[in-house]
């Protein structure tokens, strides 16, 4: 049996408070809204009770953020793509931000088991004045548990329509990609965190984002396999390769915190579930 689950998450501003509403079809839920930073920023945890996707499963997640609203979304665990005997598994996430909206999209990693056939797609559409911090983390197999990513294909798609597109397929059988010096060089976690604006960032703000990210990288143990770039005047990206998820995620959280502080004047208040 396969699933096609859908979730519509909507953030809106009610006075000084950001309020979340949602509709769902199938096994996708949003847990109770939390306000550890006060009413202006609404924290939510997205849960998928089955715990993973098999061939033929589809998860469709749509999020909208209304003017002046600020939402933060994370997950309690990895999105697991299990082995497939035919049809691919697909997760599609579409976030749409109105003018003056902010969104922090911070799920835990996508975990690709050997023999999976899967695609993970993220699309961010921002109106002028909207801003978003999001990340994407992919783990290939469970190397410390003796479960390598030996076979299978995983496609990763990240898009800001008309602004920025990254799409690539990781084939476990491609030795040059998996282990070559110009590929993953034996690393089994690839991750990126990106700051996206709905209009071109002023030069000073863009440079501040790059400087803050590079300071984090220079102080981190993964500095040899990480870097910060700005592929478009509306986008700043930090990328990193790591042997496993944990050090890469630590670097991304530090970069997220630095951008929060330098670009939004907010302290890096981590979601409570990250401490569990």
UniProtKB/Swiss-Prot annotation:
Keyword tags: Chaperone, Cytoplasm, Nickel insertion
GO molecular function: nickel cation binding
GO CC terms in record: cytoplasm
Keyword set includes Cytoplasm: yes
Superkingdom of origin: Bacteria
Pfam families: UreD
Subcellular location: Cytoplasm
Purpose: Required for maturation of urease via the functional incorporation of the urease nickel metallocenter.
Family: Belongs to the UreD family.
Subunit structure and binding partners: UreD, UreF and UreG form a complex that acts as a GTP-hydrolysis-dependent molecular chaperone, activating the urease apoprotein by helping to assemble the nickel containing metallocenter of UreC. The UreE protein probably delivers the nickel.
Protein's name according to its UniProt entry: Urease accessory protein UreD
Organism: Paracidovorax citrulli (strain AAC00-1) (Acidovorax citrulli)
Gene: ureD
């Amino acid at each position: 049996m396969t699933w096609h689950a859908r979730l519509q998450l909507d953030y809106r501003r009610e006075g000084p408070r950001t309020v979340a509403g949602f509709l769902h079809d199938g096994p996708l839920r949003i847990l109770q809204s939390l306000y550890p930073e006060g009413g202006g920023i609404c924290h939510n945890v997205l849960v998928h009770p089955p715990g993973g996707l098999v061939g033929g499963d589809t998860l469709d997640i749509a999020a909208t953020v209304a003017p002046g609203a600020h939402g933060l979304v994370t997950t309690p665990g990895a999105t697991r793509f299990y082995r497939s005997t035919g049809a691919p598994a697909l997760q599609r996430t579409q976030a749409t931000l109105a003018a003056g909206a902010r969104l922090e999209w911070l799920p835990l990693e996508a975990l690709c088991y050997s023999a999976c056939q899967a695609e993970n797609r993220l699309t961010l559409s921002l109106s002028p004045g909207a801003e978003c911090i999001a990340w994407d983390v992919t783990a290939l197999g469970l190397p410390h548990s003796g479960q390598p990513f030996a076979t299978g294909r995983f496609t990763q798609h990240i898009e800001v329509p008309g602004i920025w597109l990254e799409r690539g397929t990781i084939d476990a059988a491609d030795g040059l990609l998996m282990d070559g010096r110009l590929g993953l060089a034996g690393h089994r976690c690839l991750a990126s965190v990106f700051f996206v604006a709905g209009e071109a960032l002023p030069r000073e703000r863009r440079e501040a984002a790059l400087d803050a990210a590079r300071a984090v990288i220079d102080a981190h143990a993964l500095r040899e396999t990480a870097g910060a770039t700005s592929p478009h005047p509306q986008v700043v990206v930090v990328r990193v390769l790591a042997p496993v998820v944990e050090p890469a995620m630590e670097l991304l959280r530090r970069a997220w915190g630095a951008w929060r502080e330098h670009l939004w004047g907010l302290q890096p208040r981590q979601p409570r579930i990250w401490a569990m």
